[in-house]
């Protein structure tokens, strides 16, 4: 058995004295593990960092075997990602939720979204938007997508500013007003057909609250899991950055 594919490094663990078991999210073969001989050595370590894109050749005698990887670097983002706290927490969190995908099951849209997200991670505000969109996409990919295109009560497609915490459906301003205190806020950058001209700190916090609730309820808790420490670390880094930006210059 042999195939060649692009992959994004999700994680690495040492195996024996010098090898490593590498977990990739590949474009055509899904989340896939393999042994890299010499992967724990100084030459390969910088290549096998979470967030890096590699070209991987996987070989095994039988399809169900772990197999071995021969990898070459395509885009080495890790040094940049790991230079900031939001980058460290962000790539760790994205890898942890990508790991929720079943092994060896192709998810090309998720691969493309992860690749695009990691390529635009320098600014913490942009990174936060990418993380929220990735969490939404993962909910949909795992069968728990939110219905944000029209109002769950009236069917309207405009003025959608709330989300029902029960159904995961959008709710229009008029329909939701009597229950506004019980509803989640739908930030402008997630509203169907709208282009957010400004991104506020509250928008980002509302986005994380929205995706966090449904990820926990539908995906994590049934598996006996909770949100990763990396997710909390990313949100804390975002909050600190927002607080610094709000302090007026002397």
Curated annotation (Swiss-Prot):
NCBIfam families according to UniProt: reco
Family: Belongs to the RecO family.
GO cellular component, one term: bacterial nucleoid
Role this protein plays: Involved in DNA repair and RecF pathway recombination.
Domain of life: Bacteria
Name of this protein: DNA repair protein RecO
Coiled coil stretches, renumbered: none
Assigned keywords, A-Z: DNA damage, DNA recombination, DNA repair
Alphabetical list of SUPFAM superfamilies matching this protein: ArfGap/RecO-like zinc finger, Nucleic acid-binding proteins
GO biological process per UniProt: DNA recombination; double-strand break repair
HAMAP family: RecO (MF_00201)
One Pfam short name: RecO_N
